[in-house]
Amino acid sequence: MQIIEITEPKQTDCQQKLQIAVGIDFGTTNSLIAIATNRKVNIIKSKGDKELIPTTIDFINEDLIIGNNKGLRSIKRLFGKTLKEILNTKTLFALVKDYLDINSSELKLNFANKKMRIAEIAAEVFIYLKNQAEKQLKNNITKAVITIPAHFNDTARGEIMLAAKIAGFEVLRLIAEPTAAAYAYGLNRNQTGRYLVYDLGGGTFDVSILNIQEGIFQVIATNGDNMLGGDDIDVVITQYICNKFDLPNSSETLQLAKKAKETLTYKESFNNDIISINKQTLEQLIFPLVKHTINITQECLEQSGNPNIDGVILVGGTTRIPLIKDELYKAFKINILSDIDPDKAVVCGAALQAENLIAPHTNSLLIDVVPLSLGIELYGGIVEKIIMRNTPIPIAVIKEFTTYADNQTGIQFHILQGEREMAADCRSLARFELKGLPPMKAGNIRAEVTFAIDADGILSISAYEKISNISHTIEVKPNHGIDKTEIEIMLENAYKNASIDYTTRLLQEEIIETEALISNIERSIIELTTLLSESEISIINALFDNIKYAVQTRDQTLIKHSIKEFKSKIKNIWIQNIININDLRK
């Protein structure tokens, strides 16, 4: 935990200059920047007196243009994505096909005769927001709280932080968008409850369940659809207009559809010289999409383990559509909080949090975040992350583990810190062993491991075996001996090696599962020796030798081929009636 040091200003003729920090909502469709003073939020306006700045980047005659609704759109969807993912995802490829540098080994886009990474491109949006704020506030702006989707992975978080850093920002905090929205509604003021945040923006849909305990926010469940938003509703309306009124599927027709949608949020009908459409027709057209979001929301609530909620918070301009509020109320019969402009709820929360972090007149006690992920080494050297980087503390996470081999009487736990996929690439924090376990078959032991970080950043790890009632607890300080520079180096290495690490992990998981397969079938063969002929045993042993050799080569393709060959040939042996082939890896 960090405590803000309070410095009393000296008695001089010059008033002490206040620090300034802004809140930024980097949205899929639009972005906003705001500043809070004495808990009153002022949203910075751009050229043309607009608060919503389209998150688009275009180059015209080598001049950078931000927010003209042309050029590259939906940059936010590209955070954390690899070149391979872009090429294999139709919707993502469509976003960047005109800019993609297919000759690069990593994801880069061609802009103004430059090859730029996503973070470098997104930085241009941050620079634009920063410039607008500095012009209006007549002050240098270097500190910011930035909102991110609750589902953002470490790579995506790293890229958005890098983009902000390139733009000249010191990122005080990354906070989840649902947390920011709840903060904007004042739910941080010693309130307790569970809130559902329904966020339907222009390009994405996210839903989160927040548990709030006296100012501590915890996202306990998330769900969503990264390819569903207000833009998809626009497409449905456009298609209807084209068919109904014999209009071309053009940008002009799309703008007409958007105008109709916006008008029908507060009127019963929309009419002009070209088209006419009423609210009932609109609701019939978009009902399947709205129903889809309700289903996702219900799934999220089920995942949270508790169906009870104290309120629904609406975020995103698309939630202005009355049908959405109606369907949410039908589904949950709960109070819907919508008195803050849904386009601005997230940035308002970010601005309020920014003020809370730097205001010198407040004796603020800040809740810290986990600087690097914490996890356990699994069999094969794989890291199982328990608490992810940037998780707010205090926090406690429980996971269950089991034994890999038969008759294990102890489990060794190796505690690690870092973002890499393999234990050898992470920082070792501590080791301990849970001893005296009853000898049982592999997989039957149930060891419950709890990672708990208190408000002072002290990590306590406890392991409890349910059958024997054996337990062990240790305390470690995850930040001991590691400074900010080392953290940055570890994050940079994780970013550079993300693709290789992921491939290595997949291979190791393949090997572990294959070794388990070999062990299980060898055990079955020993039990069935008297039922098999010598030729059958010879065939099976030859197949096993192929699999074992494939594992030794660490060739994932060869491993899969050897298993496939085994499954194919074993069908010709009577043992197939005893060994369930469906249990083999597909």
Curated annotation (Swiss-Prot):
GO MF terms held by the record: ATP binding; ATP hydrolysis activity; ATP-dependent protein folding chaperone; unfolded protein binding
Keyword Nucleotide-binding carried by entry: yes
Keywords in alphabetical order: ATP-binding, Chaperone, Nucleotide-binding
GO biological process, one term: iron-sulfur cluster assembly
Lineage top rank: taxon: Bacteria
Pfam families hit by this protein: HSP70 (PF00012)
Known function: Chaperone involved in the maturation of iron-sulfur cluster-containing proteins. Has a low intrinsic ATPase activity which is markedly stimulated by HscB.
Family label: Belongs to the heat shock protein 70 family.
Protein name: Chaperone protein HscA homolog
Species name: Rickettsia typhi (strain ATCC VR-144 / Wilmington)
Protein encoded by which gene: hscA
